[in-house]
Amino acid sequence: MHELTVNGVQIAFERQQGTSTPPLVLIHGFPLDHSSWDALLPHLEGADVLLPDLRGCGESAVVDGAYTIADMAEDVIALLDALKIEKAAIVGHSMGGYVALEIARKVPGRVSGLGLVSTQALPDTPERKAGRYATAEKVGDQGSDVVAASMAPKLSADPQHVSALRELIQRQPAAGMMGALAAMAERPDSTDLLSTFKFPVVIVHGLADGLIPVERSREMKALIPQASLTEIPDVGHMPMLDAPTETAKALKDGLLSS
C-alpha cells in the first residue's frame, strides 16, 4: 500500500500501472476497502488503475468527528491532485457510487467518464436514515463484527465469497464504519445532477441485488441519454466479485479509449 496525506487525511491506496487511458479510479463501497475490487483487476490488465481506501476504511486514517460524502469526494480529488492526475474515469460501487457522483458534481471537467456499480442517485428515506444511525450505535457498542455478521450474507450468494467478505468487514475500523454510516445517511439527492453529465456513463447492476434494487439503476439510465446499463442475471450487490468478466467488459468498453 502507498500512503499520502491529502485534504488533511492520510489516505492509503494501491496503483496498478498500465498504458491504457484515461486512468481508472475504483472507489469501494461500505463496509469494505479497496480490496473489494481485487477480482476485477486481472480483467483490467493494461489499465492504469487507482484504488483508494476511503477515510476511515482499510488502511486510511480514521477521522475524528462527523464528515460527509462530499468530504470523502474531496479526499479523492486531493489524491488525484497529489498524483498529478488531471482527468480520470471515476467508478464507484454502492457507497463509492455516492462518492463518485459527488466528484462529478464538484469537478465535472476532471471526469472523463463515470461508472456506477450497484448504486443509486436517491438519498436515504427517513426509515433508511434511522436504520443507519441505529446500526452505527450497534457498531459503537459491539464493534465491526455486528455488521460483518448481518451484511456479508447480503453481499454475495457464493459461500466462499461470503466468508471472505465477513473477514474483510471485521477488519474495518469501527469508528470509520460509524462515520461512513452517518455520511451515507446525510447524503444529498443527486437525481437532478444526472441530466447534466456530458461524459460517458456506464451503469452495472446485478439483477439479484437485495440491497439496492436494479430499478434504481434503470431510473438513472432513463435520465442519462448517453448511459449504458449492464444488468447481470443471478448476481447480487457485488458484480465485480461475482461477475468480474462482465463488469470489466462494461467498464472497459464504455470508459477506456485505448
Question: Language model features by range: what are they?
Answer:
Residues 1-24, 45-48, 85-86, 171, ...:
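Alpha/beta-hydrolase fold catalytic core
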Residues 7-65, 69, 79:
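Conserved HGGG/HGGXW glycine-rich cap/lid loop of the alpha/beta-hydrolase fold
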Residues 70-88:
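Conserved acidic catalytic loop of the alpha/beta-hydrolase fold
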Residues 83-125:
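Conserved hydrolase catalytic core segment
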Residues 124-130, 141-196:
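Conserved alpha/beta-hydrolase catalytic His-Asp/Glu region
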Residues 214, 218-237:
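Catalytic histidine neighborhood in serine/cysteine hydrolases
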Residues 235-248:
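Catalytic histidine-centered segment of alpha/beta-hydrolase-like enzymes
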